[in-house]
């Protein structure tokens, strides 16, 4: 019984720590949103938030960063953007070796694989709408399935209650506003 009380108390401490980080970091995130890309890459800011704010374990962080790199590569390919060879090599390795071999993914693939699948389907639907010139708020939201996976990772690591309490911080990780998206789509 003492062990059970210990684990319950430990769980409450983790939730309290996550809530505190979320409350203090959301101000930190919003105050730096405009300079995020000037002072670091998106991967840098994602990693920093995964460590400092979301308190994710190393394997989960590596899996999420690898997934980010793969998603960015495929998005650049589809958009016809210039691709850096080193980035392509890293993403190929991540897609074929790093992601499936990651211990966090292996432990949770029954949850993560359907989420990745759904994110791809939502991205494809969004892309189809955008190519038809019908970009809208829904296509903007559907193209950001990566952040659904980040939130699910928080839930897997810290539990449902913690994910509910810190979800708004995950939402703020998305670096593009609806206005920026609509402007980009009108110029495409």
Per-region residue spans from a language model:
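All-alpha prenyltransferase/terpene-synthase fold signal
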Residues: 1-188
């Amino acid at each position: 019984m003492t062990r059970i009380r210990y684990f319950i108390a430990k769980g409450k401490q983790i939730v309290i720590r996550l809530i505190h980080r979320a409350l203090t970091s959301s101000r930190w995130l919003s105050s730096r949103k405009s300079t995020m890309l000037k002072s670091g890459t998106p991967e840098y800011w994602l990693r920093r938030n995964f460590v400092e704010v979301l308190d994710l374990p190393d394997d989960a962080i590596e899996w999420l960063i690898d997934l980010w790199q793969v998603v960015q590569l495929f998005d650049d390919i589809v958009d016809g953007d210039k691709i850096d060879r080193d980035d392509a090599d890293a993403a190929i390795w991540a897609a074929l070796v790093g992601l499936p071999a990651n211990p966090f993914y292996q432990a949770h693939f029954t949850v993560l694989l359907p989420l990745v699948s759904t994110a791809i389907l939502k991205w494809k639907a969004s892309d189809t709408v955008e190519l038809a010139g019908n970009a809208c708020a829904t296509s903007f939201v559907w193209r950001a399935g990566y952040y659904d996976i980040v939130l699910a990772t928080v839930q897997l690591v810290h539990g449902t209650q913690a994910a509910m309490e810190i979800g708004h911080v995950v939402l703020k990780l998305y670096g593009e506003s609806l206005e920026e998206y609509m402007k980009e789509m009108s110029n495409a």
